[in-house]
Amino acid sequence: MSLSTEQMLRDYPRSMQINGQIPKNAIHETYGNDGVDVFIAGSGPIGATYAKLCVEAGLRVVMVEIGAADSFYAVNAEEGTAVPYVPGYHKKNEIEFQKDIDRFVNVIKGALQQVSVPVRNQNVPTLDPGAWSAPPGSSAISNGKNPHQREFENLSAEAVTRGVGGMSTHWTCSTPRIHPPMESLPGIGRPKLSNDPAEDDKEWNELYSEAERLIGTSTKEFDESIRHTLVLRSLQDAYKDRQRIFRPLPLACHRLKNAPEYVEWHSAENLFHSIYNDDKQKKLFTLLTNHRCTRLALTGGYEKKIGAAEVRNLLATRNPSSQLDSYIMAKVYVLASGAIGNPQILYNSGFSGLQVTPRNDSLIPNLGRYITEQPMAFCQIVLRQEFVDSVRDDPYGLPWWKEAVAQHIAKNPTDALPIPFRDPEPQVTTPFTEEHPWHTQIHRDAFSYGAVGPEVDSRVIVDLRWFGATDPEANNLLVFQNDVQDGYSMPQPTFRYRPSTASNVRARKMMADMCEVASNLGGYLPTSPPQFMDPGLALHLAGTTRIGFDKATTVADNNSLVWDFANLYVAGNGTIRTGFGENPTLTSMCHAIKSARSIINTLKGGTDGKNTGEHRNL
């Protein structure tokens, strides 16, 4: 059952209360009981979008993040005095990773934790007979090991990142717009905000433009790259008779003007930047790191209204005398803890039924239903000999190309390749269409897989990643168990997911298309032939807290306000109710912008929440 604020406080251990009173968080000593306008759980780019817009509108925001702040952008003001560090910086901006992108693979691996790990046979036949082993029929459980997870229904590679900035501290920065709806693919594509097609296009275009401005999307940062130009124009030439479009991949980044060999990748830090570098805004914002949002509590009246958020100071667990749990009260509550974290908090609050079938008294009956993910095909190729040979000849008559090659050959006469060491990587895509219903990335980047050994020079390797779309179906579920907890003492997530036949057919065609495109570029790297990746590896889980028009099939309305709740909002990729192949971050930011404007309008009384605030490098 869901808890009221009074029940939460009554159940709270007397030993943890302060002088027998409600253990309020220390922020209320500064702001008072009614001084917090917006509580946000989660500090990724979506939570940061809410924070930026709300703070710029003059609202006081308290944000909690379960992880630590471990990457910072340090700025120096013009007069030379130090400006405070801004958290959530993209870790790939470190020079060592820009010089050797394959080393960044291990950073990504270290930042990801699997969500649900099936418990396999733990019998080790060659183990010392006197050593411990699990009794027959039982298993050890820790760090995501889940005895309830059936392997054939799992998204085995689905993972989460805990830390300020979330996955934006290591993401690929790909920010395409999700394609508009297509009649031949119902349930897939950009979700509708209006049933009037013209109004829907107008609103989405405005939201996408604002999101692109906020995160700093560009398609021009790799224009003066030999490899990018070679791959892009070669594919355009190969497919010109079929009129298939190949174009630069939209990326949230900018090339440094004074050091053009480096690109700066954007992250949540770019959204936090204006807050941390404006004294007035900074006073309106509090970020509590290493704080878990445990659950939410209702006010206890007839209205479904959140009265408090219970948070736990994870660092205080090291000191038994420290205050572990406390309560934060706000006017509005925003959950931006990811497609796993949001339903986990709501489930732990008692707002949804157990297991697969919702209970009749569930406050949020569609929580964790209709989930979608992206089947993913991957390969790596080594560029064709004739393409590499053509580099010396400046085949497209570009002055910057000719100069870069000449300088490289002059400085490095023993190098077998004419491609400069610091030549930017390719960043190419072909759009999602009815004929080719998948998103593509033809590039060279670091993921949790696809690292290249020393045998082949990275300059001639191209990665091909194809992302498919799956159909939203009510029986594809994310459920939670009380008898098993994750590594952070929250209910263990379990997937009940099976793709539709139509989704599988599209995935087969997607693989064939990737192989055809790859054959136009070069030969397969023996260690990375065409393959389907583990389910969930795209890390684009969606639909867990889906929003939309239909209360019967969604969790919240199009302003992300949970149905029948007065002040509870959901945010992030989980809000996207449709299937899609593109990277979802930009679309989730659009939902956040629309939602933040609604919150500002409610709390400020009549403003639309739009702003023209400045932000770093954009």
UniProtKB/Swiss-Prot annotation:
Binds 1 FAD covalently per subunit. One of its GO terms (molecular function) is flavin adenine dinucleotide binding. Substrate binds at Q441, H443. Keywords: FAD, Flavoprotein, Oxidoreductase. The modification Tele-8alpha-FAD histidine is found at H170. Its EC number is 1.1.3.10. It catalyses: D-glucose + O2 = 2-dehydro-D-glucose + H2O2. Gene3D superfamilies: FAD/NAD(P)-binding domain. The active site is at H540 (proton acceptor), N583. Its cofactor is FAD. Homotetramer. Catalyzes the oxidation of various aldopyranoses and disaccharides on carbon-2 to the corresponding 2-keto sugars concomitant with the reduction of O(2) to H(2)O(2). Belongs to the GMC oxidoreductase family. This is Pyranose 2-oxidase. It comes from Lyophyllum shimeji. The lineage of its organism: Eukaryota, Fungi, Dikarya, Basidiomycota, Agaricomycotina.
